[in-house]
Regions:
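Conserved catalytic or regulatory cores that recognize and/or transform ribose-phosphate-containing ligands
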Residues: 1-136
Length: 136
């Protein structure tokens, strides 16, 4: 399944709300993925791998199954760089993701609203900039 098959509200309104709120944080640059906006399949692959590899922090929302998202998470896993994985409260998440998080000793972050995601990312960003590590 592709993320493009996620509910319209999630793909547009919710993602836009999260991205807009994250963009206004200090020291944050949003690396947008091409998605369906254009380019060839190879362009999308190369761009998404570059973004996933380059970013100081990747934020993944995993409540809607997506093969591409899974590939991006695994790419990020191999970089050994920080990532935050979110799922809406009460949503099931594949054991492949929960097992990876357990191995990394990292929590699956639950949220009820876009504001919850932004708050946790901002806390991580602040801790990262201060050099104290990720907040619990």
């Amino acid at each position: 399944m592709a993320l493009t098959e996620a509910p319209e509200e999630f793909r547009t309104t919710f993602q836009d709300e999260v991205k807009s709120a994250l963009r206004v944080l200090d020291n944050v640059e949003m690396l947008d993925f091409i998605g369906l906006q254009g380019g060839t399949a190879v362009d999308v692959f190369k761009h998404d791998v570059a973004c996933t590899t380059k970013a100081n922090l990747c934020v993944f929302i995993v409540e809607h199954p997506s093969i591409g998202l899974g590939m991006e998470i695994m790419q990020r896993y191999h970089t050994k760089r920080p990532m935050m994985i979110f799922a809406r409260e009460g949503q099931k998440v594949t054991r492949m993701v929960t097992g990876m998080l357990e191995q990394l000793n990292q929590p699956l972050l639950r949220y009820e609203s876009a504001a919850d995601i932004v708050r946790l990312v901002d806390a991580f960003r602040s801790a990262f900039l201060e050099g104290v590590g990720a907040p619990e």
